[in-house]
């Protein structure tokens, strides 16, 4: 499984694996998954919502958000610690994932100024985050899925812990992480995935560790033992995830769009760091922005 697939799987893979397991485990699992997914459903109010018809197998986009609230008992709005745009195109049999740095310098609608990308969620939740990314990339953002930091921790614990191959020795939050294969519980996985200041690659190194944690979760979810613990997994998902995709939408994606998951292309919107008023940002030049915009437009069949 490619790194891109592992990122995509943290949000859809867990749900779809459980859904597809219904065939072998019967009506009770179907009912439990349905009820849990109903709890995650949360529509968004947008001035101009981009519509897509999943019944016609049209390409669609989804904004994937990892939110830095829910950990350590925090309940405030939080910010989007991770932002990924996913496009799913069954005709081309491809899913494209583009990561956007949290410090990307962007216009945030209604704020009258430019700011960090991850502040959009703090100012206006998923709706404003979707509007901000839609305006910045000049593509329609059809749906969103968000999961908070508590969700990551609870998912790791629900699957009984994970293993990752670590390539950097460092300490974070009282935990020591050494080079090689290491075992992580939920608290350790959270600390492992959040470190960036000791990493020579900064935020990009942090994103790499997030992908490794995702890989560990997905590997456990795909195992028989993890599926048998589906109640704990469903609880972690339903308590910590929000999306405007209904359970019926997820079923359509699982069954009608699976050809698009055979090829997953991963990309990163690359910026250059700069300081302004003592705050660090990432600025993306026009050539790089245009490159990514066109890549996503091609996948969504838009001009």
Curated annotation (Swiss-Prot):
Q: In which pathway does it act?
A: Cell wall biogenesis
Side of membrane Extracellular, spans:
28-303
The chain's Cytoplasmic topological domains, given as residue ranges, are: 1-6
Q: Does the keyword RNA-binding apply?
A: no
Q: What class of enzyme is it?
A: transferase
Alphabetic keyword roster: Cell membrane, Cell wall biogenesis/degradation, Membrane, Signal-anchor, Transferase, Transmembrane, Transmembrane helix
InterPro entries, from UniProt?
Answer: LytR/CpsA/Psr_CW_biosynth, LytR_CpsA_psr, TagU
Note whether Membrane occurs among the keywords: yes
Membrane topology is: Single-pass type II membrane protein
* Superkingdom of the source species: Bacteria
What's the protein name? Polyisoprenyl-teichoic acid--peptidoglycan teichoic acid transferase TagU
Naturally occurring in which organism (per UniProt): Enterococcus faecalis (strain ATCC 700802 / V583)
Organism lineage reads as:
Bacteria, Bacillati, Bacillota, Bacilli, Lactobacillales
């Amino acid at each position: 499984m490619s790194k891109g697939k592992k990122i995509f799987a943290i949000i859809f893979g867990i749900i779809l694996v459980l859904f597809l397991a219904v065939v072998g485990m019967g009506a009770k699992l179907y009912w439990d998954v349905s009820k849990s997914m109903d709890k995650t459903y949360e529509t968004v109010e947008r001035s101009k919502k981009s519509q897509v018809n999943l019944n016609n197998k049209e390409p669609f986009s989804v904004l994937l958000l990892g939110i830095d609230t829910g950990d350590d008992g925090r309940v405030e709005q939080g910010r989007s610690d991770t932002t990924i745009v996913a496009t799913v195109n069954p005709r081309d049999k491809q899913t494209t994932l583009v990561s956007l740095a949290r410090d990307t310098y962007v216009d945030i609608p209604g704020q009258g100024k430019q700011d960090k990308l991850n502040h959009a969620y703090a100012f206006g939740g998923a709706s404003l985050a979707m509007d901000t990314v839609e305006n910045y990339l000049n593509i329609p953002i059809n749906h969103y899925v968000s999961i908070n930091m508590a969700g990551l921790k609870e998912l790791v614990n629900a699957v009984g812990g994970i293993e990752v191959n670590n390539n950097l020795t460092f300490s974070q939050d009282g935990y020591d992480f050494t080079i090689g294969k290491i075992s992580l519980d939920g608290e350790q996985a959270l600390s492992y995935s959040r470190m960036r200041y000791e990493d020579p690659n900064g935020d990009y190194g942090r994103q790499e560790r997030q992908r490794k944690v995702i890989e560990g979760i997905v590997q456990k979810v795909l195992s028989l033992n993890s599926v048998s613990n589906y109640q704990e997994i469903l609880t972690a998902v339903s308590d910590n995830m929000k999306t405007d995709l209904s359970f019926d939408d997820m079923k359509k994606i699982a069954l009608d769009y699976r050809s698009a998951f055979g090829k997953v292309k991963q990309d990163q919107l690359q910026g250059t760091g700069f300081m302004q008023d003592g705050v660090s940002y990432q600025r993306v030049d026009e050539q790089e922005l245009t490159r990514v915009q066109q890549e996503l437009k091609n996948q969504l069949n838009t001009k």
